[in-house]
Amino acid sequence: MDELDEQQETVGSAEVGYDPAGLPVIRLSGEVDMSNVDALRAKIQPAIDKAPASVVFDMAGLTFMDSSGIALLLQVAAATKTVQLRDASPLVRRIVEATGLTDVLRIEA
């Protein structure tokens, strides 16, 4: 694998879809950190601006998230009633639990 391929695998991305009820499902993949969180925020902001009652973050493809990623999730939580984290890795689960955010960022079993 060359350096470019490796970089493409780690760059974070966000894809916005909607469930049958019209609520946003945001698929995060790669790494979410301070180097890309502003671009990811800009990509998901139109869905959040619609003030949905709930947002699901599908985290199955997420390989890394630092505190700026948690801050992004909290910003979304402030704009909605419910934020659910689907397929969160053990690392993300530990971060959410250790910071006492399980009431704000709900982890799906």
Where would I find each of the regions flagged by the language model?
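Amphipathic alpha-helical interaction surfaces in cytosolic regulatory modules
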Residues: 31-105
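Short, charged, intrinsically disordered terminal tails
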Residues: 5-10, 98-109
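STAS-typified acidic loop motif
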Residues: 3-42
